[in-house]
């Protein structure tokens, strides 16, 4: 008798992307550490665009992610618009999904300033010698110079 099981790595690329695009945002970190191929797939810009497009259409533009600066730290926030009445009053809920931290510093990174330019967040850190770091929100890739901290969302 033949074994009819199929490993995830044996799936066609389109089907694999479809499966990975259904993973909840909160579980993406666990999925990324499962295998190198999945991590590469999740890091690709094409997949990220497809993932965002799918999540936008699924929530009908009533739920989105935002990055907010609070108390010298950057937070990834999930914003859900519950209701908009006839007078454009909005009922919404905001939930913190993650905080931008330094890999070397468990307490976090103190950010002085954030500038958004061409789909890139440029952050200036508050230290003895301020450092500039760039964060590309679509792929969560960190663009840094050699003197900059390593940053990630937790």
UniProtKB/Swiss-Prot annotation:
Residues 5-51 form the F-box domain. SUPFAM superfamilies: F-box domain. It comes from the Eukaryota. It holds the Pfam family F-box. InterPro entries: F-box-like_dom_sf (IPR036047), F-box_dom (IPR001810). Signal peptide: none annotated. This is Putative F-box protein At2g11200. It comes from Arabidopsis thaliana.
